[in-house]
Amino acid sequence: MTSFRLTFLLTVLLAPALARAQQPASTPAPAAQPPSVAQKAAASSPTERRTIVAMRMTSGESIVLDGRLDDTIWGRTQPAGDFVQQDPDNGQPATEQTEVRIAYDQNNLYIGVTCFDSDPDGWLGYQRRRDEQLPADDRFIWTIDTYLNARTAYYFEMNPSGLMGDALQGVGNVNNRQWDGIWTGRASRSDVGWTLEVEIPFRTLNFNPGSDWGINFQRTVRRKNEESLWTGWARNQGVRRMTNAGLLTGIRDVSQGHGLDIKPYAVATSVSSPGRGDSQFRNDGDVGVDLFYNLTPGLRANLTVNTDFAETEVDQRQVNLTRFSLFFPEKRDFFLDGSTFLDFGSGFAISGAFTPFHSRRIGLDEASGTQQRINFGGKLTGQAGNQDIGVLHVQTGQEGASPGHRTVPVAGEDFTVMRLKRRLLRQSYIGAMYTRRASRGGAPIVDRHTVGLDFRLETGSFLRSQNLSAAGFFLHASSPLNAGKNSAMGLEIGFPNDPWSGELELSEVQSNYDPAVGFATRTGIRRISPTIAYTARPRQNPLIRRFQFGNDVNWILDSDDNRMLNRDFNITAFLMELHSQDTIQFRVLPSYELLENDFRISPGITLPALRHYSFTRYRLLATTASRRVLAVSPIAEWGGFYSGDRRRLALNLDVRMRPGVIFYLSTEWNKVDLAEGSFQTKLYRGIAETQFSPWMSLVNNVQFDTQSSILGWQSRFRWILKPGNDLYFVYLHNWLDDPLLARFATLDHRASSKLLYTHRF
């Protein structure tokens, strides 16, 4: 416990500095900026924040949303400009100019963007599908902090092909990209560059009427690998750090509606599972509804009845050569919407290893693994005063029947999650959490609870312009099946800056910690995790943009007797990124492990318990720029592995034939030779995306791995009839590579169609 006492002492000593850094001053202290830019960018003024004024449209004005910015209102709206580079030439004016105009009427916020370009045909815009990542495209990002609290924000982005992406930002830069707001954008190209025209209904945003908002803008010119921002352009800042955002003023007397959204849906399915003893097709139809109501401008209630997840994308398979379960993220929209208000321990890099709430535990029976139908669920998320509030309650059915499987009788369950955070100072909070999982129908485990406390102190003004954070948590999970050692706790100090960054995390997960609605990768351990990294940027080098060196360390000790169980180093011996965005890196990974129990690593191969293993692996990775038509990422890894050796080869290919037609191909091969035996694993994945427009897409995903011997194919068609109204067609087919039949035999297949409609009041 000496390490915990040391970190606790450091946290206490740093707390006053963090608090002082967050105290409001008579004039905000700006980040240090080069004098050349102070003369060019209003953002560098030491006495005022950059401001953009939204222009109110007159009763006779309207906007035709076509992306052209030729409506009358745009001519009388004062633009925001003078963007400053964050990369590569930090602090210098952007090489391509950008202008942003904002207008509004009674019901909508309008944003007009002109991205001037000296090479009007040089833009890149491969992606069209909603919410796709944009590593290869030009893009324009804007973030809106409607409460001006510098903690939460709405994140939006578009590219020259009209792709629309959005997310909800939470504390610790948590980004919930599964949020789909109702808004519309159009893109257009011209001989001066490309333009955007955006309409965001005020009903989509939560805000207090009559108040100013925080806002910031960022533009990416992909062929130059250039990032520029309106404000907050220092490398320690960025578009997602709302403490460095500008001000949006002038929005007054607008309508937020009655705050009620009704989303009914209808779904039809056809399922057959011949590989599981049920070869007959089962045809079914169902209806359900989601209700959303804004109780206040900042607090939203959600009720779902007869919930269905037919449109959910499949998980991406992974090869697991460890003793511990893999963590798969949530993909169901009901649980993702507003999930930032239910996060615990935000910012902890290792919090996923022992989180008290993981919504994928809901709707899955623990004993049989049977999927359970969700009868209804309710949520309350948002802000009230200085509090962030998240409440969730879900009831599953008395009988679980995974579609296409034989009905397995299981007890229905009730799940309850409550989360409260009290905002402190400018960027900090203290919080509490409670979860409950209660069985119905006389199950052996009647009631299980988890309670937790956490805090986070954060500032972007440490030593005037540096980021510094301190965080901690405590969790206790009750269970009638064990007594004592049911807790988890941790402390963290972070210094995420440039060129130096570092972090120290300490945690303990006791042997009986088992959160009923959470996830614990490993219990009975203490973890010490220091991290340090340094980034060097050669000046005026025509080829190289940056070098990076660093080390991530994990020491894992037995929580009872402090025996060393694991010691892992991840040494970045060399990382080089070129201005072209091509990278190459070399890592050294020394490891030590004490096996506490027998480890069946592969069928017929078991590593015996109580053996000590020390080995070192090496990893060489290269990545070509994503903006290229063919982007390649090969990985080679070799070296020791337990009692022998392991070789790993992986290859990722991204083929962007033209805007809207993209192929992702990946393969991974592991060859393991141990004293106890040898084996191989293989993983293949192919994804073909046909994006007809920003409103219509078809995605085919094919995967096969030798660990499960299952070949899976999902075909997913989505048509956004209008924002908020969606039509899905999804087909899923799984085959088993049966060595006795020497062929692939069908396990199950399922076809689904789903129509969702949104009506707003």
Predicted ranges, named:
Residues 264, 285-291, 299, 305, ...:
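Extended, hydrophobic alpha-helical segments in both membrane/secreted and soluble proteins
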Residues 1-6:
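Positively charged n-region of N-terminal signal peptides that target proteins for export
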Residues 17-21:
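Sec/Tat signal peptide C-region and signal peptidase I cleavage site
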Residues 7-16:
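Bacterial N-terminal signal peptides
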Residues 234-255, 397-464, 582-639, 648, ...:
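Outer-membrane beta-barrel transmembrane domain signature of Gram-negative proteins
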Residues 373, 461-468, 472-761:
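Exposed, low-structure sequence patches enriched in small/polar residues
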Residues 22-423, 432, 445:
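Structural preference for beta-rich elements and adjacent junctions enriched in aromatics
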Residues 110, 195, 207, 261, ...:
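Membrane-spanning beta-strand positions in outer-membrane beta-barrel proteins
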